[in-house]
């Protein structure tokens, strides 16, 4: 199975297993840390510049953010299980077909999550018993942040696919770049433009966009994914969709 250029793909079925696992696991762990950094940066900067009420608002809704992010991460990681198995077995046609189905399910999930969460946000804030005086701040932040759920899904999906090909360094690089942009945009939107918590949320969405674009670009360089197949290979099959959901849902619940 070939790759295009320096795609970062690593065949983990050959070579020193201990070194392969270590070189794969370290960027994975660091990547998870940096992905959480978005909210940490928002909270620190908002608390320092906008004051106690804004800080309290972001701290209060943190559990909702982790709920959404954990669910998305779990689903996409579950999809990556089947992709990694087929990559290791060198089943190229099955690999393409699986990624096609996983992409379809990720798009559907992103749409459902975005619509459902944006509609249900006032109710969620109420369930959390957020103090009435900071609810508007909470909703201002969450509406902008969760309007970017499709981008959150895109990053986690492309990152999961890259990891399934043995490339855990690209998602880490994307996270580091995005985290730095997030800090810079936080300061610009809040200090210079005066956009408050909406600016902090928008900075996170833009940073996610950059991370998503970089991972997608790297994923598209993998040769096996650019080879053309017969049109029949791009038809949806309920069995394969069911298998991906079967792998994704338990991972999502485990992350809650």
Protein language model annotation of sequence segments:
Residues 28, 32, 44, 81, ...:
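Transmembrane alpha-helix boundary and packing residues in multipass membrane permease domains
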Residues 40, 49-52, 86-89, 164-165, ...:
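Helix-loop interface residues and adjacent transmembrane-helix termini in multi-pass membrane transporters
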Residues 20, 36, 43, 57-63, ...:
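Residue-level recognition of specific faces of alpha-helices
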Residues 106, 161-184, 202-205:
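Alpha-helical transmembrane segments of multi-pass membrane transporters/permeases
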Residues 55-115, 152-171:
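Small-residue-rich hydrophobic transmembrane alpha-helices
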Residues 1-25, 83-148, 192-248:
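Short alpha-helical transmembrane segments in multi-pass integral membrane proteins
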Residues 28-81, 145-152, 242-256:
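Transmembrane helix-bundle signature of multi-pass secondary active exporters and lipid flippases
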């Amino acid at each position: 199975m070939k790759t295009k250029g320096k795609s970062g793909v690593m065949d983990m079925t050959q070579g020193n297993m201990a070194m392969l696992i270590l070189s794969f696991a370290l960027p994975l762990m660091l990547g998870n840390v940096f992905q959480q950094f978005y909210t940490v940066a928002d909270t620190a900067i908002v608390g320092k510049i906008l004051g106690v009420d804004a800080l309290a608002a972001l701290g209060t809704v943190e559990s909702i953010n982790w709920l959404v992010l954990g669910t998305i991460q779990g689903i996409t990681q579950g999809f990556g299980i089947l992709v990694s198995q087929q990559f290791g077995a060198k089943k190229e046609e099955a690999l393409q077909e699986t990624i096609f189905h996983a992409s379809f399910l990720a798009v559907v999930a992103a749409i459902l999550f975005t619509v459902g969460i944006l509609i249900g946000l006032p109710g969620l804030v109420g369930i959390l018993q957020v103090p009435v005086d900071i609810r508007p701040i909470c909703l201002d932040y969450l509406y902008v942040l969760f309007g970017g759920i499709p981008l959150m899904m895109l990053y986690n999906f492309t990152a999961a696919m890259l990891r399934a090909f043995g490339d855990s360094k690209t998602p880490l690089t994307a996270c580091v770049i995005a985290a730095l942009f997030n800090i810079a945009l936080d300061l610009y939107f809040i200090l210079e433009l005066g956009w408050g918590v909406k600016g902090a949320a928008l900075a996170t969405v833009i940073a996610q966009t950059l991370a998503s674009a970089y991972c997608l670009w790297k994923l598209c360089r993998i040769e096996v994914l650019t080879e053309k197949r017969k049109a029949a290979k791009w038809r949806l099959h309920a069995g394969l969709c069911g298998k991906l959901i079967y792998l994704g849902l338990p991972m999502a619940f485990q992350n809650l």
